Amino acid sequence: MKVWLLRHGAATPYQQHDAERQLTEQGRLQVLQAAQWLTAIKFDRVLSSPYIRARQTADLLCTSIGHTGTIEIVPWLTPEDEVRAVTRKLDGYAVENLLLVAHQPLLGALASWLTDADRAHGLPMDTASVACLEGDFIGAGMMQLRSLQHVDL
């Protein structure tokens, strides 16, 4: 199974409610560039943070790559969520290609946890970065990092 991690594109500056920040034009361009790397992937499930910028990223990416399935908005993919709790939630997703659209520091910590069982040294993920993890199942130290790509915008 492959777990694909996509950080949202560049967003408007911090506001009173972080969850309401939206993608900027640069952020949309970043997502479109990331989509070029993912056009050949057929995602079985797409999960997104409920934050606006992540939902916009998931919508734009899925439209760009022709993904016709639903985007599942889950409350446990926010920047503050705990890696072990997210790992437990993901345990039930036995699919070939799973895409998570979320935030730092969660995605970097999740990648480190799944590949090294270490949360202290999170994987660096700029806006619209894409990481691919692969393993037989989701668990601490049970996956391998197959790729990490950063946009150049």
Regions found by a protein language model. Name each.
Residues 2-84, 107, 121, 125-128:
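Active-site-proximal alpha-helix that buttresses catalytic centers in soluble enzyme cores
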Residues 3, 95-102:
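Generic beta-sheet signal
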Residues 34-37, 146-151:
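MPN/JAMM (Mov34/JAB) isopeptidase/deubiquitinase module and associated MPN-bearing subunits/adaptors
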Residues 40-42, 92-96:
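Glycine-rich phosphate-binding loop signature in dinucleotide/nucleotide-binding domains
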Residues 60-65, 89, 113, 117:
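Alpha-helical structural signal in soluble globular domains
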Residues 104-113:
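Extended, charge-rich low-complexity interaction segments
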Residues 115-144, 150:
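Domain-level recognition of soluble alpha/beta enzyme cores
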